[in-house]
Each structure stands twice: as structure tokens, then as C-alpha cells.
Amino acid sequence: MAHCYYNSKRGCNRVMKTVALVVLISTVMVEESRGDSQEDKKRPIWNIGHMVNAVKQIEEFLDLGANALEADVTFDDNGNPKWTYHGTPCDCFRDCLRWEYVDEYLKRIRELTSPGSSKFRKGFILLMLDLKISKLSDNAKSKAGKEIADMIIKRLWSGSGEKAQLYIVLSFPYVNDIEFVRAFRERVKSKGFASEAEKRIGWDISGNEDLGKIRDAYQKLGITDNVWQSDGITNCLTRSHDRLAEAVCKRDSDKEWPSLKKVYYWTVDKQSSMKEALKVGVDGMITNDPDDLVAVLNEFSGTHRLANINDSPWQKIPRPKSNC
């Protein structure tokens, strides 16, 4: 029992209250530390809302629990980015024709991801741009890389006000599209934003090509970090998990693929498929129903959680026990 040697009862009470408060705060801090430690052991998951191409859809998907969004970027024949637009055909049960001008879309993204904005959404941490460039000539792909770099610099990283805090994954279908990457990287370097790009920009080749071929393409480009790898198919069809599991194994191994940091699956709408993908070891999923993935993560709350802004999308997190 604590003893008080102050002359007044009031002084003694103050001391006892202070001691009690210190004990309470210390206890809370210990419990929070334990809680944080337990949270750190859970795999952070990127819940990526699919085909969010109209400005009005952005907050709709965020309100459903998405912490990341995917938008399609369509170009003219010369490589100028025009619209966030998918077109037909697209996933089952979706409107394929929603769109916005790319410039206007990115302006809205900045409003939602700049901490000083009245519209700031703390939980919105990543934007994936699905670049529709495969039918372009190499010259047009190069133009597309420069134009996208200019738009990101102008709309998200420069000008008055705070810059956007979110991360960006630039996704394109095939290794033959890498002229875009060369041009993008050269452009951000020439504009003085190379360090910002290294911090904020990642890459994904999404066309289900051979994983070794994809890894070699990155090595040829000199990309040694910030790589995501996807596997998937439209929600209208089913697909084996063999290639997905192979990608997860390569992520888990620094020797196999050092630059590969995250693996995600697309497009996943059934809760049963979401559960299977989590068991395989993915870091994220593209879904038309982010609220369903939130529900699944609640079931997996002992081992998984939604990623937040403190989680780096460029950090490799191997599984504790590998099945490779």
C-alpha cells in the first residue's frame, strides 16, 4: 500500500490520484503495445474495388470498405490518356460504360487522399491504374508513359496544397508493353520526381504470362523493388489457383524474386473464393464487392486485417510456414 507523507489531506489525495493515473496509463500502454504487436503479426490485405471508373463510384466503393481502388485508363491511338473507362465486355453484373476524363479523375483522387483536404479519406491508401496500352505502337506506349507521368506529377504530387499520400500501382497486361515503363521512369527523373516515384509507384504485369518471363522483364528494366504480381480471370469464370500459388511461393523467396513484394488475385466476388485466396497467401484482391471481403476478413481476424497507410505495399511478408 502506498503511504502519503504530505501535511494536508488534499495534497495526499492529489498524490494518490496521480499515482493511480500513472498506473492506469502504464497499463493501457502495455495493453496497446500488446495489441499493436498482435496486429503487426497479421497479414495486411489490400481490398481493391474493381473498375471504379466514374467519380461518383469512388466514395461508393470506399464506403463499402475498400482501402484501394482500380480504374481503367484508355488511350487514343497516339498514346494520350483520355478516360477512365473499360467498355464492353467486362465483368458479369457490372455496368461497363461508366467513365470520367483521366485528368478530372485524378483531381478527385487528390482531394480524397491529401491529409489537409476537407474530403480526406484516411482509409484510401492505394490506386491501381489498369493501363489499356497493349494495342498501341511502341511509340504510342512511350508517349503514354510520359503523359501518365506528367498527369501524376501535376495532379497528385505538385501544385498548391498537400500532395496525395496514396501509393500507386501501374498495371499493364504484357511484357511487350514495357516501353511504357521506360518512358515513365525517364520522365519522372527528368522532372525531378524520381525519389517520389521510388516511394509511391509500383508495377504489375497482369496478363497471366509465365512468371519467369515477367521476372526477367523487370530485371531487363533494372527494376529491383515495388513489384506486385497478379493472377486471375473475370468473375464470370473460374480459374485454378496453381499459378497464384506459384506467385506466392516466388514472393516468399528472396532468392527466387527479390523485387516481388505483393501478390493479389482478381476478380473475386464469392466469399468462398476469397477465403481460399487468403489461405493460399495473397496480399490483396480485386473485387466488385469489397464489403464481402470485409466480412471475410472479420472471420480471419486472428491472422489477417485491412491494410492501412502505415503498411508499405513494397514490403515483402513471407508466410510463416511455406508450402513451396
From Swiss-Prot:
Disulfide bond annotation, renumbered to this chain: C90-C96, C92-C236
Protein keywords: Cytolysis, Dermonecrotic toxin, Disulfide bond, Hemolysis, Lipid degradation, Lipid metabolism, Lyase, Magnesium, Metal-binding, Secreted, Signal, Toxin, Zymogen
Molecular function terms from GO: lyase activity; metal ion binding; phosphoric diester hydrolase activity; toxin activity
Subcellular location(s) of the protein: Secreted
Any GO BP: killing of cells of another organism
Record bears the keyword Magnesium: yes
Tissues where the protein occurs: Expressed by the venom gland.
Catalytic activity: an N-(acyl)-sphingosylphosphocholine = an N-(acyl)-sphingosyl-1,3-cyclic phosphate + choline; an N-(acyl)-sphingosylphosphoethanolamine = an N-(acyl)-sphingosyl-1,3-cyclic phosphate + ethanolamine; a 1-acyl-sn-glycero-3-phosphocholine = a 1-acyl-sn-glycero-2,3-cyclic phosphate + choline; a 1-acyl-sn-glycero-3-phosphoethanolamine = a 1-acyl-sn-glycero-2,3-cyclic phosphate + ethanolamine
Cofactor note: Binds 1 Mg(2+) ion per subunit.
Function: Dermonecrotic toxins cleave the phosphodiester linkage between the phosphate and headgroup of certain phospholipids (sphingolipid and lysolipid substrates), forming an alcohol (often choline) and a cyclic phosphate. This toxin acts on sphingomyelin (SM) with a high activity. It may also act on ceramide phosphoethanolamine (CPE), lysophosphatidylcholine (LPC) and lysophosphatidylethanolamine (LPE), but not on lysophosphatidylserine (LPS), and lysophosphatidylglycerol (LPG). It acts by transphosphatidylation, releasing exclusively cyclic phosphate products as second products.
Protein name: Dermonecrotic toxin Hl-PLD1
Organism in which the protein naturally occurs: Hemiscorpius lepturus
